[in-house]
């Protein structure tokens, strides 16, 4: 499939999440299951063993358990952005349901789609994206201090021991990638 055929978007933060405090996007979790259907056995065991632990770990999520006669057990997840995800848990084990519920709690409610770029801004800079490299990966132009003959003068005012100037000159010169010259 080509890149133009799949939906995509720029990477954005959901509801500015992370500016201030973290807001979990899962708002409500509803478990519908039958009390006596054999396909609901894993869902019943999940409610008996794991649902209280999940509620303690996620205090911002409201958990509803609806025991009613139904053909297939299901989990309905409602998110803050209005998205609703419905998952069938027919004949699944407790561990599978536990991992599914945790996955629903960790998601944002948005569809999983291709991300165009790992960075995006609404106010782009005319200078381009910032990079810590001064040459931006380009070869050296020969205009740096190692090629222009600039004399590096260092003075160690705080140290009176012999050789301090030479050690400081060597330390600074090697960190900038050129050899310091003596005075």
From Swiss-Prot:
Residues 162-172 have a biased composition (Basic and acidic residues). InterPro entries: Ribosomal_mL43 (IPR039927), Ribosomal_mL43/mS25/NADH_DH (IPR007741), Thioredoxin-like_sf (IPR036249). GO terms for cellular component: mitochondrial inner membrane; mitochondrial large ribosomal subunit; mitochondrion. It comes from the Eukaryota. Its main location: mitochondrion. One of its GO terms (molecular function) is structural constituent of ribosome. Residues 120-144, 162-183 are annotated as: Disordered. Residues 122-139 have a biased composition (Polar residues). It is found in: Mitochondrion. Keywords: Mitochondrion, Ribonucleoprotein, Ribosomal protein, Transit peptide. Ubiquitous with the highest levels in the liver, heart and kidneys. The skeletal muscle, brain and testis showed lower but detectable expression. Expression is coregulated with TWNK. GO terms for biological process: mitochondrial translation; translation. Component of the mitochondrial ribosome large subunit (39S) which comprises a 16S rRNA and about 50 distinct proteins. Belongs to the mitochondrion-specific ribosomal protein mL43 family. This is Large ribosomal subunit protein mL43. The lineage of its organism: Eukaryota, Metazoa, Chordata, Craniata, Vertebrata. The gene is Mrpl43.
């Amino acid at each position: 499939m080509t890149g133009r055929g799949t939906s995509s978007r720029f990477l954005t933060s959901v509801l500015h999440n992370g500016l201030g405090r973290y807001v979990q996007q899962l708002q409500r979790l509803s478990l519908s299951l039958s009390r006596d259907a054999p396909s609901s056995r894993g869902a019943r065991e999940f409610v008996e063993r794991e649902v209280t632990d999940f509620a303690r770990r996620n205090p911002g999520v409201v958990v509803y358990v609806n025991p009613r006669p139904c053909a297939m057990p299901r989990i309905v997840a409602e998110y803050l952005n209005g998205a609703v995800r419905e998952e069938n848990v027919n004949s699944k084990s407790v561990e599978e349901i536990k991992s599914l519920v945790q996955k629903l709690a960790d998601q944002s409610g948005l569809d999983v789609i291709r991300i165009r770029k790992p960075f995006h801004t609404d106010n782009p800079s005319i200078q381009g994206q910032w990079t810590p490299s001064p040459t931006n990966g380009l070869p050296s132009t020969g205009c740096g201090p190692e090629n222009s003959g600039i004399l590096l003068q260092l003075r160690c005012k705080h140290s009176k021991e012999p050789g301090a100037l030479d050690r400081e000159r060597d330390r600074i010169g090697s960190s900038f990638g050129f050899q310091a010259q003596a005075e």
